[in-house]
Amino acid sequence: MAQSINITELNLPQLEMLKNQLDQEVEFLSTSIAQLKVVQTKYVEAKDCLNVLNKSNEGKELLVPLTSSMYVPGKLHDVEHVLIDVGTGYYVEKTAEDAKDFFKRKIDFLTKQMEKIQPALQEKHAMKQAVMEMMSQKIRQLTALGAAQATAKA
């Protein structure tokens, strides 16, 4: 369990360390959300592609991707069944409707994960802002103290 720290009791180097830690946490959470969005977009695109599979397109010629930049000609033979990548190199044959349901569940799961991360990211942003404001306040205090000492010596 995380312990609560009163930032008013920390000195400038400690505040700087805390700010750096919060920067890293914000970066990690932001990257996590971005990665989840990329995966979610791929699932949305895959689900949308299933809408092209219908009886009127059966027998039509198409380009089949072998890699991200290499395609070979092919014919759409079976519009009722598809192979979907379920991860780690495994593919499963499903009906087009089952595949749409699979992608919908994945999209919903990723949305929920992003919704769980978002509040933590906002909390870290707020904490970082509070630390930066405290640092500014301490710097102003030190500057004022230094100016007061300089005028007292003069």
UniProtKB/Swiss-Prot annotation:
It holds the Pfam family Prefoldin. Gene3D superfamilies: 1.10.287.370. The modification N6-acetyllysine is found at residue 42. GO terms for molecular function: unfolded protein binding. NCBIfam families: prefoldin subunit alpha. Belongs to the prefoldin subunit alpha family. This is Prefoldin subunit 5. It comes from Pongo abelii (Sumatran orangutan). The lineage of its organism: Eukaryota, Metazoa, Chordata, Craniata, Vertebrata. The gene is PFDN5.
